[in-house]
């Protein structure tokens, strides 16, 4: 007869550590999804053409941002390993290297996205959407460098097990984004 063993205290401690570390990461990832959802919801109440233009541009940038996020994920295990061994001076160098690499990637992605911007009229979208797409595209293009810098710092913070900082920054960014969207959507004379 199989007798169920009581859960070992070590396992319980591991589960607690895992949840303490992982829940802020999950909340932060949900925050990224909420960011896009809030944009879509607010623009959708304004006009169908603006929603179509924003959706197209957002999808173009999603490809670049997912690529950049995947690139930045490489830092977390390196920093985590060094931090776990107490090699804090090397951890700092890894952050500097990551910032440099992410800035280089931002320059490359900005160039690629700029080429797409110059050729947006060739991507088969209705002519009436192009004047709506262009200013929004430029705003997202300007923000690309900041997204990559944030990714570098977020992955560094995750690597040193400080996952709450990036979670709060993402949630705070959502609040600022909603406020920032509300003004031009509600007061159309302030839009680009």
Identify the role of each PLM range:
Residues 1:
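Active-site loops and adjacent core secondary-structure elements that bind or stabilize anionic groups
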Residues 4-25, 79-145, 179, 190-192:
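Short alpha-helical transmembrane segments in multi-pass integral membrane proteins
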Residues 15-34, 60-67, 142, 168:
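Residue-level signal for short hydrophobic patches within transmembrane helices
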Residues 27, 39-43, 54, 79, ...:
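Hydrophobic/aromatic residues within transmembrane alpha-helices of membrane transport systems
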Residues 43-62, 128-132:
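Interfacial/gating helices of multi-pass transporter permease domains
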Residues 51-110, 114, 147-166:
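Small-residue-rich hydrophobic transmembrane alpha-helices
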Residues 164, 174-190:
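Membrane-interface helix-loop junctions in multi-pass transport and translocation proteins
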């Amino acid at each position: 007869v199989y007798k169920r063993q009581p859960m070992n205290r070590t396992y319980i401690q591991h589960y607690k550590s895992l949840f303490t570390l992982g829940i802020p990461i999950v909340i932060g990832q949900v925050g990224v999804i909420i960011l896009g959802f809030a944009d879509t919801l607010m623009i959708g109440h304004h006009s169908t053409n603006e929603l179509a233009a924003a959706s197209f541009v957002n999808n173009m940038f999603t490809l670049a941002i997912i690529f950049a996020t995947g690139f930045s994920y490489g830092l977390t295990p390196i920093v985590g390993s060094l931090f776990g061994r107490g090699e804090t001076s090397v951890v700092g160098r890894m952050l500097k290297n990551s910032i440099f690499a992410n800035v280089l990637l931002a320059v490359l992605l900005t160039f690629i996205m700029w080429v797409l911007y110059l050729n947006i009229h060739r991507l088969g979208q209705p002519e009436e959407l192009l004047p709506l797409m262009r200013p929004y595209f430029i705003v997202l293009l300007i923000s690309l460098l900041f997204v990559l810098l944030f990714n570098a710092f977020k992955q560094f913070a995750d690597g040193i097990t400080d996952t709450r900082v990036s979670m709060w920054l993402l949630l705070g960014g959502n609040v600022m984004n909603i406020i920032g969207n509300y003004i031009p959507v509600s007061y159309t004379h302030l839009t680009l």
